[in-house]
C-alpha cells in the first residue's frame, strides 16, 4: 500500500461524490477518457472496484492509500471540481421546482443509481433560488430521527418549507460542505465556511455553519443578496427627524457613534449606510469586521481572524497607524477594544461601532462596565442609535380595524382609532407581511446628557432627566403602527424588554 499522494492534476473525478465517499474510491479520468486512475483504500469493496472498471471502460492504474490520505485527496479533488458544480447551478436558471425536485430525488443514501451528482446540485440550487425569491435571510437544514426539516427565515421569522425524505440529509450536507470548502470527514465539531454564487444573475454570498446534533449535522446558510441592498440612510425606514440628526452626527470630525440592538437587528446595515455619504476621495475610511458582509468600493476593509490572533483590538490598533479619517469597528466586545476606540475618537478620528444592548441608554452602562471612565465617555460619545426590525404589512392585503378599549389601554391610543392587521395574498405568500423596516431611538449626547454622564448619573436617572424629550423604540414603533406600516403586535414582539 502506498501513502504517497497521486500526482494526477490533469485528471478529474468521475464518480458521484456520495458514491466515492461511501465506497472510499476515486475514479480520475482526463477529458478524452483515454486515461484513468483509481485511488482507494485497502478496505474498498471488490464489487466497487469491479463497477468502477466497468464505468471507466479503459485500463486502470490502481493506487491504494491510507484512509487519511484518501480523505485528503477526496476533499481536494471534489473541492476543485465544485467549481463545475457552481457553473452547473448557474446554468440551470430559475425554471425549476424545489418541492418537485425534493420529491423526485432517488430514495438512496449515496445516489448510486444516478449517473452523476447533478440531482443533488439541482436541489441545492432550487433551494437557494426559492430562498432568494422569498427574500429569506437564512436556510436551516435540520435532521431528526424520522425526517429532514428545511426552514427559511423570512422577515425575521422561521417558516417550515419542506419535510423531505430523511435519506437526503447526508447527501445535502456533504455537497454543501464540499462547496463551502469544509472538511467533509469531520462531523464531530462545528465548522464555518462560505461560498459565492450567482443565481439568476444575482450575486449571492452564502455563509455556511455546521453543528453536530443527535441525528447528524445541522446546517445553517446565511444568505447575503448583494443586489438587493441599497446602503444609504434613506432606505432604513428611519423617521425624518432621526435621519437628519444621524446625518449631522456622521459629519462631525471626531467622536464615537454607536448602534445598539440584538443580533440580526440590522446594526451592520445601518453602519454601512452611515458610511455611504462619507465615502469620498478626500477621506480615508477603514473598517475591521467579523465578517465583512458587504464590499464597499473605496473603503479599506479588514476581516477579524481569531486563528491568527487578528482580533478587533489588534485590527483597530493597526488601522490607527494607517492615517484614517473614519474608522468602523464591527463590534465593541471587550474593554480593550472600547479603550482603543475611545482614545481614537479623542485623537481626531470619527469612530462608528455596535454594541449588544437593549436600549440607547444601556450603551452608557455597558461601556462603563467595560472600564471606560465617565469623564472619557462624556467627552468622546456623540450619539447612540438603538434599533429593531419589524415586519411591514403587505400593502396589497392589509385590513383596517378599530381598536377596542383593551388595546387602547395597551397602546395609549384612543378607543376607535383605526389601525391595520395582516391579511394574506399571493404577493406576500399569504403571510400578511412583506419586507421589514427599522424602528429606532436616537440618544444625542448634548451638553445636558454629557454633564449627567460626567457626574456619574445612572441610566434611570438620565431617563428621568430626559423625560418626554426621549422617544423610545416602542414609541417610534407606535408611530409606524399609526401610519399603517406595521402592527402593534410586531412592535411588542421586538420590544418586550421596554
From Swiss-Prot:
EC number annotated for this UniProt entry: 7.4.2.8
Gene Ontology biological-process annotations: protein secretion by the type II secretion system
Q: Which UniProt keywords apply?
A: ATP-binding, Cell inner membrane, Cell membrane, Membrane, Metal-binding, Nucleotide-binding, Protein transport, Translocase, Transport, Zinc
Q: Which GO terms describe its molecular function?
A: ATP binding; ATP hydrolysis activity; metal ion binding; protein-exporting ATPase activity
The record's listing under InterPro entries reads: GSPE_N1E, P-loop_NTPase, T2SS/T4SS_dom, T2SS_E_N_sf, T2SS_GspE
A cellular component term from Gene Ontology for this protein is:
type II protein secretion system complex
Describe the function of this protein: ATPase component of the type II secretion system required for the energy-dependent secretion of extracellular factors such as proteases and toxins from the periplasm. Acts as a molecular motor to provide the energy that is required for assembly of the pseudopilus and the extrusion of substrates generated in the cytoplasm.
What is the protein's given name? Type II secretion system protein E
Which family does this protein fall into?
A: Belongs to the GSP E family.
Q: Where does Zn(2+) bind?
A: 394, 397, 425, 428
Subunit note: Forms homooligomers; most probably hexamers. Interacts with OutL/GspL. Forms an inner membrane platform subcomplex with OutF/GspF, OutL/GspL and OutM/GspM.
PANTHER family referenced in this protein's UniProt entry, alphabetically: BACTERIOPHAGE ADSORPTION PROTEIN B-RELATED (PTHR30258:SF27), TYPE II SECRETION SYSTEM PROTEIN GSPE-RELATED (PTHR30258)
Q: Does the keyword Lipid metabolism apply?
A: no
Which NCBIfam families does this UniProt record tie to the protein? type_II_gspE
Amino acid at each position: 500500500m502506498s501513502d504517497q499522494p497521486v500526482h494526477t492534476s490533469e485528471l478529474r473525478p468521475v464518480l458521484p461524490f456520495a458514491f466515492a465517499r461511501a465506497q472510499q474510491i476515486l475514479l480520475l479520468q482526463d477529458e478524452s477518457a483515454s486515461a484513468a486512475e483509481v485511488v482507494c483504500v485497502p478496505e474498498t469493496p471488490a464489487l466497487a472496484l469491479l463497477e468502477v472498471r466497468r464505468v471507466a471502460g479503459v485500463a486502470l492504474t490502481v493506487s491504494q492509500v491510507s484512509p487519511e490520505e484518501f480523505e485528503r485527496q477526496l476533499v481536494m479533488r471534489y473541492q476543485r471540481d465544485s467549481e463545475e458544480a457552481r457553473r452547473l447551478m448557474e446554468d440551470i436558471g430559475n425554471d425549476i421546482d424545489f418541492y418537485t425536485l425534493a420529491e423526485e430525488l432517488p430514495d438512496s443514501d449515496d445516489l448510486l443509481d444516478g449517473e452523476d451528482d447533478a440531482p443533488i446540485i439541482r436541489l441545492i440550487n432550487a433551494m437557494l433560488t426559492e430562498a432568494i425569491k422569498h427574500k429569506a435571510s437564512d436556510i436551516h437544514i435540520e435532521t431528526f430521527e424520522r425526517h429532514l426539516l428545511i426552514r427559511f427565515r423570512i422577515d425575521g421569522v422561521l417558516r417550515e418549507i419542506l419535510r423531505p425524505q430523511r435519506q437526503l440529509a447526508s447527501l445535502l450536507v456533504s455537497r454543501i460542505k464540499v462547496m463551502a470548502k469544509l472538511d467533509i470527514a469531520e462531523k464531530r465539531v462545528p465548522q464555518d465556511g462560505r461560498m459565492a454564487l450567482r443565481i439568476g444573475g444575482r450575486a449571492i454570498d452564502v455563509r455556511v455553519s455546521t453543528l453536530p446534533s443527535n441525528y447528524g449535522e445541522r446546517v445553517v446558510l446565511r444568505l447575503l443578496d448583494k443586489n438587493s441592498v441599497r446602503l444609504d440612510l434613506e432606505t432604513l425606514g428611519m423617521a425624518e427627524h432621526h435621519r437628519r440628526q444621524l446625518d449631522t452626527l456622521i459629519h462631525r470630525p471626531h467622536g464615537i457613534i454607536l448602534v445598539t440592538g440584538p443580533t440580526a437587528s440590522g446594526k451592520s446595515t445601518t453602519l454601512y449606510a452611515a458610511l455611504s455619504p462619507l465615502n469620498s476621495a478626500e477621506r480615508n475610511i477603514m473598517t475591521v469586521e467579523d465578517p465583512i458582509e458587504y464590499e464597499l468600493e473605496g473603503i479599506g476593509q479588514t476581516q477579524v481572524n481569531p486563528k491568527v490572533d487578528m482580533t478587533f483590538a489588534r485590527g483597530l490598533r493597526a488601522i490607527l497607524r494607517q492615517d484614517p479619517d473614519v474608522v468602523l469597528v464591527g463590534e465593541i466586545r471587550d474593554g480593550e477594544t472600547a479603550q482603543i476606540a475611545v482614545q481614537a475618537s479623542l485623537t481626531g478620528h470619527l469612530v462608528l461601532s455596535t454594541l449588544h444592548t437593549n436600549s440607547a441608554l444601556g450603551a452608557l452602562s455597558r461601556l462603563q462596565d467595560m472600564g471606560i471612565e465617565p469623564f472619557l465617555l462624556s467627552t468622546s460619545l456623540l450619539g447612540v442609535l438603538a434599533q429593531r426590525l419589524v415586519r411591514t404589512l403587505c400593502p396589497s392585503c392589509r385590513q383596517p380595524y378599530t381598536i377596542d378599549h383593551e388595546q387602547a389601554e395597551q397602546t395609549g391610543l384612543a378607543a376607535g382609532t383605526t389601525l391595520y392587521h395582516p391579511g394574506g395574498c399571493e404577493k406576500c405568500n399569504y403571510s400578511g407581511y412583506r419586507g421589514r423596516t427599522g424602528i429606532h431611538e436616537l440618544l444625542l449626547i448634548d451638553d445636558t446628557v454629557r454633564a449627567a454622564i460626567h457626574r456619574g448619573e445612572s441610566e434611570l436617572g438620565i431617563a428621568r432627566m430626559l423625560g418626554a424629550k426621549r422617544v423610545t423604540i416602542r414609541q417610534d414603533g407606535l408611530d409606524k403602527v399609526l401610519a399603517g406600516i406595521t402592527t402593534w403586535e410586531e412592535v411588542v414582539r421586538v420590544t418586550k424588554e421596554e
